[in-house]
Amino acid sequence: MDDPDCDSTWEEESEEDGEDGQADDTTDEDTGDDDGDAEEARPSLFQSRMTGYRNWRAMQDMQRYRHNYPDLTDQDCNGDMCNLSFYKNEICFQPNGALIEDILQNWKDNYDLLEENHSYIQWLFPLREPGVNWHAKPLTLKEVEAFKSSKEVRERLVRAYELMLGFYGFHLEDRGTGAVCRAQNFQPRFHNLNSHSHNNLRITRILKSLGELGLEHYQAPLVRFFLEETLVQHKLPSVRQSALDYFLFAVRCRHQRRELVYFAWEHFKPRREFVWGPRDKLRRFKPQTIPQPLTGPGQADKDEGSRDPSQEAGTQGRTCGSGRDLSGDSGTAEDPSLLNTKPSDGGTLDGNQRDEAKSLSPKESKKRKLEGNRQEQVPGEADPQGVSEVEKIALNLEECALSPISQEPREAEPPCPVARVANEVRKRRKVEEGAEGDGVVSNTQMQASALPPTPSECPEAQKDGNGPEDSNSQVGAEDSKSQVGPEDPNSQVGLEDPNSQVGPEDPNSQVGPEDPNSQVGPEDPNSQVGPEDPNSQVVGPEQAASKSPVEDPDSDTMGTSVDESEELARIEASAEPPKP
């Protein structure tokens, strides 16, 4: 470095401030570095001033500030403390100013006014040295003590700091630590900061005033933020030189300043041109409490931690805090779908299954089985069955479960096949009587009515029975010995018994008109098929003279016998006929 007496950053702890440069010179001579490296680390005064790598004037200015202006003495101002009165909201800043509360409340988003007005900054952040605004009085030591002891004044000072951070596109993340991050509108504000270089002087004043008025812990986070935005993110190229010459050395804490210089040396390109610290000491330096960047406003954790600065270079919303690890959210909501995979839940589930196995419904049992299987599932694996599928399976199980208590009463069973045959015989006879008019029943119709029901009409053999309109359907083809009535064995109607068939094949089964005894009229009450239906008589009295074929009385299988009629009447009374 060109003048070691102007930088006490790397002096030994036991040395005095006036002997700062001797340690650097001695150490550099003792080290075995090459001559080229030594020349790069300590360029000549002429080279520094010509190339601008290290500003000698900035070194003197910051050294003077860090040592509390040893050449200054407080002037007698007759007890006037203008800076304190301004912060107590008693006077307006000069010239043509306003009260501090008016500035803090109404100037917050008025970026044009904050940019164009050059008189308020000396009042908001006073220093012990005079500035360009001669109306602003230098800060006195009495005022410094009053600033530190007044809670109201310190609160307004923090609000003024937040006002200027917002103007530059920053956000104060934590008032306690001074952590800084990007604001939501940082892009246009960064553009304004790159376009107006006079803001670099304002930032230097802000850093100095924070150190004077008791907010030294705000210095290092802000400087770290600028170093990262200039050297790592390259978003503020116009601020880079001021950050290295002024901002970096405004930090009064020597240890924090060393950490910041080391961070700047790590990210400076090309490193051989870095002249803001001795290279040999930077190589041996081990950072311990480098301020850590934050992720952004509203997205930072408040726990302390340590991270490697090189790993944080690529993060987007950068902030600076002192030894803070705010890389993520403090809490993460657990996935509701994984709540059932905990071991404690699994043990409770097994106990409930053993205790309540008998009282569970099929739906609940299926749900618990699926939950048990889900416990064995890999956390990263997708659930094979969703909630909707589980509900469907449970509903299907409920429908298939046979429980006499929970099931509703079923509909009435279909009538017996024998009763259905008798009912069909009655209906066919009524239709035939109305259609022919003479009451003659053909042999084929008699045969069809006497045939047993087909398997399609039996509900035990087949569910969907045919309607009574099919006159050719046979009932009981599989059982040739189906009985019409269990009491009368002679009433069996089957295909195996040729005598039971009534058709043209058996001439004896046909009864002609020559046999008057074959007439079945109302005089014989036993010949009625059903007592409820008087129209079910086979032949009326007016048809006695007609030549209608009547069954031979010798045939023991005719349905008009007394036993058969009684049996049919009994069956019909027990079973309701279906609606037509």
From Swiss-Prot:
Residues 489-538 have a biased composition (Polar residues). Signal peptide: none annotated. Sequence repeats lie at residues 467-475, 476-484, 485-493, 494-502, 503-511, 512-520, 521-529, 530-538. One of its GO terms (cellular component) is perinuclear region of cytoplasm. It is found in: Cytoplasm, Perinuclear region; Nucleus. The keyword Phosphoprotein applies. Residues 467-538 are annotated as: 8 X approximate tandem repeats. A motif (Bipartite nuclear localization signal) lies at residues 257-286. Its main location: cytoplasm. Keywords: Acetylation, Cytoplasm, Growth regulation, Nucleus, Phosphoprotein, Receptor, Repeat. Residues 300-310, 352-374 have a biased composition (Basic and acidic residues). Residues 1-44, 285-390, 405-580 are annotated as: Disordered. Residues 1-38 have a biased composition (Acidic residues). The modification N-acetylmethionine is found at M1. Highly expressed in 6-day old cerebellum and brain. Lower expressed in adult cerebellum. The protein is detected in germinal cells of the cerebellum, in neurons of the deep cerebellar nuclei and in the glia in the medullary layer. InterPro entries: OGF_rcpt, OGFr. The keyword Nucleus applies. The modification Phosphoserine is found at S327, S361, S365, S403, S548, S555. GO terms for molecular function: opioid growth factor receptor activity. It comes from the Eukaryota. Belongs to the opioid growth factor receptor family. Receptor for opioid growth factor (OGF), also known as Met-enkephalin. Seems to be involved in growth regulation. This is Opioid growth factor receptor. The gene is Ogfr.
